[in-house]
């Protein structure tokens, strides 16, 4: 039987695999904010990035290792392909963390060996112990992944795993890279590893899975029943293609059905000991933070954290819930940190009160960013009678999102109506302080604003998504706007909020432009180096 840590470890890969969602690119300050909230959430491991991929990724992993990876905090992990250059960069990046981990991988399925790696099984069996041994010479905690394990020959998989453990791997990760397996198949794969790998008791079995068939969470729960003790997942289930296994769904499934899962961990059925170390009351807060910073809206019917997760429309259901919530609710909303919007602050609230509430919500701002956030708060308080936590989250997210900006919106003014053509006048300031103003017409006020901004910025792009939603109820509610721009096949998101949705649209468009420019500059300054014939964009 695999090494058993006594509970199920939660390995969060939001900052690595989750960030690979189209348009979800995060800057360093955003990654740090999410990592700090993940630490408050209580995850065991944070996979902070892929250090060899770029100077920006290296800096993000190193900064998180310095500021989040404390003695009692989460393990800080970096991803590395099975090459010495990747592994050395990863070791250097996680070095500041008291508890660091190198996560190295190579594909094991025949389709990957033939068409991607162009290597034989014999080649892989030689590479694995060499690279794992090298990683272990640099750090004590080494995780090894068999990419596309779900489509690998089990007998070959057993050989590779045995070799990796013998070389020093302390965690063995089994990825369902393309979300191909079914729960019974995936559970059987984990059971087979436990039965046929002689030294499996020296390592923890981990699983990583994508949601292409909507089975990722079900696969993971079946894996736990068969001996997996680490789950690699993301907040809101974000990730490549259809996403990854959802952290909040996994944690709450084991929380609500603890009596069912206890025996599979060798416990008595009625043991009250939690199956994970996650503080469930932080789940909603973490979900909202990730959604705000990535610009990826959580679907209303998303389990656990969706807007409708605890809503009841049917009269029969409403009647039952009013009499006893257990009639139609298996989770108390307070367990996941969800409470009714409350008036926590008002127009007379001071800077200290705003700062304290923002810290409770997971935002630790610099003095400069707090000053700007407080100014926006006071402006909003003059226009809006009730200020809620969602309002605060909306107005502060831009301070975290835009630490550096090529363009800054100075003002926007629009005129439109049933008998006039929509016209927008905008002023934009560049990084050198130069200010330019231009007017443009469009099919509507937002279209006119975007045309004017494009004229000023002169940055080629295609607008592929515009969405707006109300943060809270009421005619004076803040409107949140998300805009996605595409250039050269890459997506860049911008997110902003204001009581005037046209102003919010202008701010979101400028945010997206700034991300696009920064992304293009990173690509030109730090082109991907590829010392070995491996996939330059790992998905696991």
Curated annotation (Swiss-Prot):
Its cofactor is Mn(2+). Coiled coil: none annotated. InterPro entries: 2-IPM_HCS-like, 2-isopropylmalate_synth_dimer, AIPM/Hcit_synth_CS, Aldolase_TIM, LeuA/HCS_post-cat, LeuA_allosteric_dom_sf, LeuA_bact_synth, PYR_CT. Its EC number is 2.3.3.13. GO terms for molecular function: 2-isopropylmalate synthase activity; acetyl-CoA C-acetyltransferase activity; manganese ion binding. CDD domains: DRE_TIM_IPMS. Keywords: Amino-acid biosynthesis, Branched-chain amino acid biosynthesis, Cytoplasm, Leucine biosynthesis, Manganese, Metal-binding, Transferase. Mn(2+) binds at residues 17, 208, 210, 244. It catalyses: 3-methyl-2-oxobutanoate + acetyl-CoA + H2O = (2S)-2-isopropylmalate + CoA + H(+). It is an enzyme of class 2 (transferase). Residues 8-269 form the Pyruvate carboxyltransferase domain. It is found in: Cytoplasm. Pathway: Amino-acid biosynthesis; L-leucine biosynthesis; L-leucine from 3-methyl-2-oxobutanoate: step 1/4. HAMAP family: LeuA_type1. Belongs to the alpha-IPM synthase/homocitrate synthase family. LeuA type 1 subfamily. Catalyzes the condensation of the acetyl group of acetyl-CoA with 3-methyl-2-oxobutanoate (2-ketoisovalerate) to form 3-carboxy-3-hydroxy-4-methylpentanoate (2-isopropylmalate). This is 2-isopropylmalate synthase. It comes from Synechococcus sp. (strain CC9902). The lineage of its organism: Bacteria, Bacillati, Cyanobacteriota, Cyanophyceae, Synechococcales.
